[in-house]
From Swiss-Prot:
One of its GO terms (biological process) is ribosomal small subunit assembly. NCBIfam families: rpsS_bact. Pfam families: Ribosomal_S19 (PF00203). Protein S19 forms a complex with S13 that binds strongly to the 16S ribosomal RNA. This is Small ribosomal subunit protein uS19. Keywords: Ribonucleoprotein, Ribosomal protein, RNA-binding, rRNA-binding. GO terms for cellular component: cytoplasm; small ribosomal subunit. The lineage of its organism: Bacteria, Pseudomonadati, Pseudomonadota, Gammaproteobacteria, Pseudomonadales. It comes from the Bacteria. Coiled coil: none annotated. Belongs to the universal ribosomal protein uS19 family. One of its GO terms (molecular function) is rRNA binding. HAMAP family: Ribosomal_uS19. The gene is rpsS.
Length: 91
């Protein structure tokens, strides 16, 4: 279920502070975060945010289409290696 409009979007305060500082300085360096639950706001457009996927930080370049989504949606946590082929079927 989506979040109530009355409450507004959720974003961790420490991430919001980092983004405001990066926007002021026009810093091109990625902003590292572990907060996958934070929503992407219009202030983040154009910034690169390194989102943690459980193993490493995945760089995500934020564009206008991503506003309203969560950061974790753009950094997958699972590695899909494909289905194993049946050895009997190959013969």
């Amino acid at each position: 279920m989506p979040r109530s409009l009355k409450k507004g979007p959720f974003i961790d305060l420490h991430l919001l502070k980092k983004i405001e500082v990066a926007a002021e300085k026009n810093d091109r360096k990625p902003v590292k975060t572990w907060s996958r639950r934070s929503m992407i706001l219009p202030q983040m457009v154009g910034l690169t945010i390194a989102v943690h996927n459980g193993r490493q930080h995945v760089p995500v370049l934020v564009n206008e289409d991503m506003v309203g989504h969560k950061l974790g949606e753009f950094a997958g946590t699972r590695t899909y290696r494909g289905h194993v082929a049946d050895k009997k079927a190959k013969r």
